[in-house]
Every structure is written in C-alpha cells, then in structure tokens.
Amino acid sequence: DDLIKECERYNIALITLVSVTTPKERVKKLVKHAKGFIYLLASIGITGTKSVEEAILQDKVKEIRSFTNLPIFVGFGIQNNQDVKRMRKVADGVIVGTSIVKCFKQGNLDIIMKDIEEIFKK
C-alpha cells in the first residue's frame, strides 16, 4: 500500500507483473491498482528463457482483459523476430530485454542495429 501511495504521489505508473501461473483471484487483485500497462510474463523462470505455449498466453490475456482495459504487454523469453511476431498476435505489445542486451555486448554499433532491426522487422 505504501508503494502504491508513493507512486501515485509522484505520478509514477507502477507496472503490474502477471505470470501465466498467477491464480485468477490474484490477477483480479493485482490489476485493481494497475497503471500504464500489464506486463505478462511469457516464460516461467529467468528472463530470456523459452516462452510458454501461445494458447496458454492467449487464455491468460483473456483472463486479464476480463478485469482491466489496460494494454497487456508480453515479455520474458522473447528472443527473436519469430517470438515478437507470435506475441503481437496475443497481446497489445511486446517487451524485448535480454536479446537487446546481448546485442549491445557485441560492441559493434552496426551489428547491434542490424540485430535489433532483425528482432523487430515486420
């Protein structure tokens, strides 16, 4: 409650994270105070690992939408262009983190930009 109050005080959107394993009643409570968007975790485990099945994510998106009109973004386990394309069918947006960090570790700006463009190409 203190965190929510402080975020509201400073006009900061506290992004709510929901996993495919989060029980429905917990989802309902989590999205009640959500601002900005809902971050749906597309994998179980650490970031950058394999995503769960698309059908499971679709079901979870439907469940979340039954409680909120906020946009739903999918992240965790989004590794390449194919993942981005699949997730855009499921959710309002896609969050790519680890794959972009890996691109930056290569150090060559031209390669970085090419790799990032490859991830997001239509």
Feature names for model-found ranges:
Residues D1-R9, P23-K29, T47-K62, N81-V84, ...:
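Active-site-adjacent beta->alpha loops and helix N-cap segments on the catalytic face
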Residues E6-I15, K32-I38, K89-G93:
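Glycine-enriched alpha-helix->loop->beta-strand junction motifs that scaffold or abut catalytic
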Residues C7, I64, M87, I116-I119:
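Hydrophobic positions in alpha-helices of CheY-like receiver
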Residues C7-L17, R65-G75:
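Short beta-strand/loop segments at the ligand-binding rim of alpha/beta enzyme cores
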Residues I15-S19, T49, E53, F76:
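Glycine- and other small-residue-rich loops at beta-strand/loop junctions that grip anionic moieties
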Residues V20-T21, K114-K122:
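Extended, intrinsically disordered, low-complexity segments
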Residues T22-K32, V74, I78-V94:
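Catalytic cores of alpha/beta
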Residues L40-G48, G77-I78, V90-L109:
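Glycine-rich phosphate-binding active-site loops on the catalytic face of alpha/beta enzymes
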